[in-house]
Design a protein with these regions (language model features):
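Short alpha-helical DNA-recognition segment
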Residues: 26-49
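A short, Lys/Arg-rich alpha-helix, primarily the initiator
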Residues: 2-25
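DNA major-groove recognition helix of helix-turn-helix/homeodomain DNA-binding modules
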Residues: 57-69
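Histidine kinase transmitter module recognition
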Residues: 22-25, 50, 65
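Residue-level signal for the short linker/turn that defines the boundary of a DNA-recognition helix
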Residues: 17, 27-28, 54-57
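Small-residue (primarily alanine) positions within well-ordered alpha-helices
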Residues: 16, 34-37, 63
Length: 69
């Protein structure tokens, strides 16, 4: 039986962690990312923590902020 860790068992959390990693790599604060994705900082923090499911528009705006097309 294949073992799974907490991240792979929860794809939402895995994506949220990748968004956080990309934000840290490009050097944006959570406030800057909230502005770039047009959500409140509180909502952004919930998305980044994997505590709330995020819409496609949020993902698209993250990609644009990170320079990914």
């Amino acid at each position: 039986m294949m073992q799974t860790n907490k991240t792979t068992a929860n794809p939402l959390l895995e994506i949220a962690q990748r968004i956080r990693e990309m934000r840290e790599i490009v050097g944006y604060t959570t406030a800057e990312m909230a502005e770039k994705t047009e959500v409140s900082e509180q909502q952004y923090l919930q998305y980044e923590a994997g505590q709330a499911d995020f819409p496609f528009t949020f993902m698209h705006k993250c990609a644009l902020a990170f320079g990914v097309e």
